[in-house]
Amino acid sequence: MFPMITGFMNYGQQTVRAARYIGQSFMITLSHVNRLPITIQYPYEKVIAAERFRGRIHFEFDKCIACEVCVRVCPIDLPVVDWKLETDIRKKQLLNYSIDFGICIFCGNCVEYCPTNCLSMTEEYELSTYDRHELNYNQIALGRLPMSVIDDYTIRTILNSPQIKNK
């Protein structure tokens, strides 16, 4: 008889605990009732990227000294740096620089450790394409500055977004 009574007591405690959990989750749901949705009509409205957003990498060919620090600090050895040694001036001459954004993890190590600041992160994040070989950017494509979202008159930027206010 005693095991049956303790079983009913445990059942009662479990019922109270379950009701408390349901009540807590219901209160969380009610706290979100007055909030506005954060839906953005993507092609026509865009949220301005944060200040430290890690988008496409911009490369300045004239500043690069072909030191290959970017390759050494990259966790996947991604940047391809081709250079030749100029014997008369005893310096490296950069021939080609490319990054495959299909493989890049956008960690920003190459930008952070570059001694000449020839690499920088842009706000461009629309890199989608149908052919993955188009994601391999050479020094010409990397040197192209992205069109700013703010300057594009066809896109309405979302400045009063709750996501921006929280950051």
From Swiss-Prot:
Key word Methyltransferase present: no
Matches recorded under Pfam families: Fer4_9 (PF13187)
Cofactor(s) in the UniProt record: [4Fe-4S] cluster
Residue ranges of every copy of the 4Fe-4S ferredoxin-type domain listed in the record: 55-84, 95-124
Localization: Plastid, Chloroplast thylakoid membrane
Keywords carried by this UniProt record: 4Fe-4S, Chloroplast, Iron, Iron-sulfur, Membrane, Metal-binding, NAD, NADP, Plastid, Plastoquinone, Quinone, Repeat, Thylakoid, Translocase
GO annotation, cellular component aspect: chloroplast thylakoid membrane
Positions contributing to [4Fe-4S] cluster 2 binding: C74, C104, C107, C110
Topology class, membrane: Peripheral membrane protein
UniProt EC number: 7.1.1.-
Catalysed reaction equations from the record: a plastoquinone + NADH + (n+1) H(+)(in) = a plastoquinol + NAD(+) + n H(+)(out); a plastoquinone + NADPH + (n+1) H(+)(in) = a plastoquinol + NADP(+) + n H(+)(out)
Chain positions recorded as [4Fe-4S] cluster 1 binding sites: C64, C67, C70, C114
Cofactor note: Binds 2 [4Fe-4S] clusters per subunit.
A single MF term (Gene Ontology): iron ion binding
Subunit record text: NDH is composed of at least 16 different subunits, 5 of which are encoded in the nucleus.
Function: NDH shuttles electrons from NAD(P)H:plastoquinone, via FMN and iron-sulfur (Fe-S) centers, to quinones in the photosynthetic chain and possibly in a chloroplast respiratory chain. The immediate electron acceptor for the enzyme in this species is believed to be plastoquinone. Couples the redox reaction to proton translocation, and thus conserves the redox energy in a proton gradient.
Name the UniProt record assigns to this protein: NAD(P)H-quinone oxidoreductase subunit I, chloroplastic
Annotated gene: ndhI
